[in-house]
C-alpha cells in the first residue's frame, strides 16, 4: 500500500475559523472531503466504555450515552485530561481517516481531509498529505462565531480556542493559507482562487 497521500490536502485552522463552511464550498466544485470530527464522533461511541472508565459517570446523560458538552468542558479545562482522551481516541481516528484516504487516492484527483488538530497530532508525520491548508480567522472573531453558533459563553468559547495551537503558529507551519476574516462571498472568492492555483493532476502523477 502506498502510504503517501499524493492527492490529499489537510484542511485545518482553529475552531470557529470557518473550515466547515469552506468544505461546503468545496463540495459545490465537486471536491470530496473526509471529516475528522464526524469520524471522532463515531469513534467516541465505539470506545465509550474506555472513556467512561477514565472520566467517570459524571459525563453520562440519563440514557447512559456520553454528554459531549460536559466532556468538552472537562477536557478543555484540563490539558492532562484532554491528552488522555486524545490518547484513547486518536489512534482509531487516524486509522479510519487513512483508510478512507487510501480509497480516495485511487481516484487520482485532489481531495481534502478536514482535521482541526492536524498540527497538534503530528502534521505530515501522522498524515502524509501532499499539502496543508489553514483557514485563518483572528482569535476574537473566531470566539464571536463560536459563541453565536454553539450558544457558548465567552469563557467556554475562549477555552476551546486556547486548547488548540495558536492560529498564527498554524499559519507558519502551513503550505497554504486562506483568509476568512470577511463574509461568505469573500471566502467563496478565496476558495475559487485557491482551487485554480492547485497543480494539475497530471503534474502530480508524473512527479
Curated annotation (Swiss-Prot):
Example GO molecular function: dephospho-CoA kinase activity
Domain DPCK: 8-207
Record field: catalytic activity: 3'-dephospho-CoA + ATP = ADP + CoA + H(+)
Domain of life: Bacteria
Functional pathway: Cofactor biosynthesis; coenzyme A biosynthesis; CoA from (R)-pantothenate: step 5/5
Any one GO biological process: coenzyme A biosynthetic process
Descriptive protein name: Dephospho-CoA kinase
Organism of provenance: Helicobacter hepaticus (strain ATCC 51449 / 3B1)
Lineage: Bacteria, Pseudomonadati, Campylobacterota, Epsilonproteobacteria, Campylobacterales
Amino acid at each position: 500500500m502506498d502510504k503517501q497521500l499524493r492527492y490529499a490536502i489537510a484542511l485545518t485552522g482553529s475552531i470557529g475559523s470557518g473550515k466547515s463552511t469552506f468544505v461546503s464550498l468545496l463540495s459545490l466544485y465537486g471536491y470530496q472531503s473526509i471529516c475528522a470530527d464526524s469520524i471522532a464522533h463515531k469513534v467516541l461511541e465505539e470506545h465509550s466504555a474506555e472513556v467512561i472508565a477514565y472520566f467517570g459517570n459524571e459525563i453520562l446523560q440519563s440514557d447512559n450515552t456520553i454528554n459531549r458538552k460536559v466532556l468538552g468542558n472537562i477536557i478543555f479545562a484540563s490539558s492532562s485530561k484532554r491528552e488522555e482522551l486524545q490518547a484513547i481516541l486518536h489512534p482509531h481516528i487516524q486509522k479510519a481517516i487513512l483508510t478512507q484516504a487510501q480509497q480516495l487516492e485511487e481516484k487520482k484527483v485532489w481531495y481534502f481531509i478536514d482535521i482541526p488538530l492536524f498540527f497538534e497530532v503530528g502534521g505530515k508525520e501522522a498524515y502524509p498529505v501532499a499539502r496543508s491548508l489553514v483557514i485563518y480567522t483572528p482569535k476574537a472573531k473566531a470566539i464571536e462565531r463560536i459563541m453565536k453558533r454553539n450558544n457558548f459563553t465567552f469563557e467556554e468559547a475562549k477555552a476551546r480556542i486556547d486548547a488548540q495551537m495558536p492560529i498564527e503558529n498554524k499559519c507558519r507551519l502551513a503550505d497554504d493559507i486562506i483568509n476568512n476574516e470577511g463574509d461568505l462571498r469573500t471566502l467563496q472568492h478565496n476558495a475559487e482562487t485557491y482551487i485554480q492555483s492547485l497543480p494539475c493532476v497530471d503534474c502530480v502523477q508524473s512527479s
